[in-house]
A protein has these predicted regions:
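A short, basic/flexible loop-to-alpha-helix module at the beginning of a structural domain
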Residues: 2-10
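Alpha-helical scaffold segments in soluble metabolic enzymes
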Residues: 31, 35, 69, 94, ...
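Internal catalytic-core helix/loop-beta-alpha segment
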Residues: 61-94
Length: 130
């Protein structure tokens, strides 16, 4: 189930861990960010700052709400973790183009509720290994 992540050291050794998602995946991203932070990991949820998100959406377009934040905040010592049921959201795909290591936690079926539950389970399993 955790083939999405090689080992917990990838997260522990990152300067910052950026996390993002849309809709239900945004809630999972925020929850996972809290779990990482409580373990002493420098974690930032990219979908938590609505002022920055709406400024980027207004000035550049919603496809760039995550990638523009990463262009300003991130460097190659950081890690991006994305949650997406479809794996097709343009703003997620743009974020993955930013030149930092990343982990994609995407859905495997069209059952959104079941996939969102699976993503939260993965997040909890990762957190328990830190």
């Amino acid at each position: 189930m955790l083939k999405e992540i090689v080992n917990a050291n990838v997260i522990r050794n990152s300067r910052f861990v950026f996390v993002c998602g849309n809709g239900g995946s945004a809630a999972t991203a925020e929850h996972f960010t809290n779990d990482l932070f409580s373990k002493g990991i420098r974690a930032i949820c990219l979908n938590s700052n609505t002022s920055i998100m709406t400024m980027i959406a207004n000035d550049y377009g919603y496809d760039y709400v995550f990638s523009k934040q990463l262009e300003v905040l991130a460097d190659v010592r950081d890690l991006l973790i994305v949650f997406s049921v479809s794996g097709k959201s343009p703003n997620i795909l743009e974020a993955l183009k930013v030149n930092i290591p990343h982990i994609k936690i995407f859905g495997r079926s069209k059952n959104f509720g079941r996939e969102e539950d699976r993503h939260l389970k993965i997040a909890h399993q990762i957190s328990s290994r830190l």
